[in-house]
Regions:
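A short, Lys/Arg-rich alpha-helix, primarily the initiator
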Residues: 1-22
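Conserved hydrophobic/aromatic packing and binding residues within compact polymer-binding modules
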Residues: 16, 30-31, 41-44, 72
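Alpha-helical residues within the helix-turn-helix
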Residues: 21, 32, 63
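Recognition helix of helix-turn-helix/homeodomain-like DNA-binding domains
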Residues: 35-51
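Short, basic-rich loop-to-helix N-cap that marks the start of a DNA-contacting helix
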Residues: 48-60
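Short C-terminal boundary/hinge segments that cap the last helix of small helical domains
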Residues: 66-77
Length: 77
């Protein structure tokens, strides 16, 4: 059974993938803009591999996507 925390990581990853695709950029382009590896972006976005993410990395990704941090973590609607 997936834990609540794992479910939250999964939702963050899916939200990042959504905004990345909406912006029309690849995982590699996002990784370069955020200053992290493409593999890390891939792991974060993978719904079958909930990956923890540091606040610093999350802020870097939000900046790279030009979205507020809250839009990446506000999935409780």
């Amino acid at each position: 059974m997936i834990s609540r925390r794992e479910q939250e990581y999964k939702m963050i990853g899916l939200t990042i993938a959504y905004y990345r695709k909406l912006k029309g950029i690849s995982q590699l382009q996002l990784a370069e803009l955020a200053g992290i590896s493409r593999t890390h972006i891939s792991n974060i976005e993978a719904p079958n591999m909930p990956t923890s993410i540091s606040l610093e990395t999350l802020l870097d990704i939000a900046d790279a996507l030009d979205v507020p941090l809250s839009s990446l973590v506000d999935f409780k609607q």
